A protein has these predicted regions:
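Aromatic-capped interface at the extracytoplasmic side
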Residues: 28-46
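N-terminal Lys/Arg-rich, disordered targeting/topogenic segments
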Residues: 1-10
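Sequence context surrounding c-type heme c attachment/ligation sites in exported
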Residues: 45-100, 128-217
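Glycine-rich, flexible loop/turn motifs
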Residues: 35, 48, 111, 123
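Short, solvent-exposed interaction modules
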Residues: 115-133
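Carboxylate-rich helix-loop segments that flank metal/cofactor sites and access channels
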Residues: 101-121
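Hydrophobic membrane-insertion alpha-helices, especially the h-region
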Residues: 15-32
Length: 217
């Protein structure tokens, strides 16, 4: 029987297989990258060079957030605790623990511990940490119940829509100044968050920007 198709058509099935394979790999790679916690961030909990439990330090020992994150009230960016901060206690407490080897090495060499960053806003987004903390926004609102975390993860998406939810209705999040760093605070019986928030919103004249220029400068 005569061959009605040219010889080059013999390669079509192989080409189809290759194209499908490449597209499949691209889709699989895209899903793996863009939909993993490291990219979407919520739930992202990387392994750190030193295991650090906020549950032990905050809940059991009663340490205030500001002891380690000492610049949160005055700086635009919250600081990662220095090795000196850690060693203020750990030269005496659990001074030989294997878990703290990286801290002791940093103390000895002067090189910082290579902590893995968890919360990271894009460079095109402006955020001032001190402004929020000094106007009634608690650590809890952005970072979740860190006091209950044996290992820190990202609790909130910190996306534009998430930011705007607060900027459009800050009364749903503002709390008394004395309770900013109290991770267990809840409104007292007979009070509600919105009424408390409205009081501070009016007193502090809180009017967060909701236009592009407010956060993209």
């Amino acid at each position: 029987m005569a061959n009605f198709f040219p010889k080059w058509t013999n390669w079509i099935p192989l080409k189809i297989v290759i194209i499908v394979g490449v597209l499949g790999a691209a889709v699989t790679g895209g899903i793996w990258y863009y939909f993993t916690p490291k990219f979407t961030r919520v739930g992202y909990m990387p392994t750190q060079p030193v295991p650090f439990s906020h549950t032990i330090h905050v809940e059991q020992l009663g340490m205030d957030c500001r002891y380690c994150h000492s610049f949160v009230e005055v700086a635009s960016h919250s600081n990662v605790p220095s090795t000196q901060t850690c060693m203020a206690c750990h030269t005496q407490i659990r001074a030989t623990s294997p878990k703290l080897e990286a801290v002791r090495e940093s103390w000895k060499t002067g090189r910082p511990v290579n902590w893995v960053r968890i919360h990271k806003l894009p460079d095109y987004s402006y955020f001032n940490h001190a402004v929020h903390v000094n106007r009634g926004v608690s650590c809890y609102s952005c970072h979740g119940a860190v006091n209950a975390m044996t290992a820190v993860w990202q609790d909130q998406p910190q996306s534009m829509s998430w930011c705007l939810d607060c900027h459009r209705a800050p009364e749903n999040f503002l709390r008394p100044p004395a309770e900013i760093f109290n991770m267990n605070w809840v409104p007292a019986a007979g009070e509600n968050q919105r009424d408390i928030g409205m009081k501070f919103k009016d007193a502090w004249e809180v009017n967060p920007p909701v236009t592009c220029g407010g956060c993209h400068r």
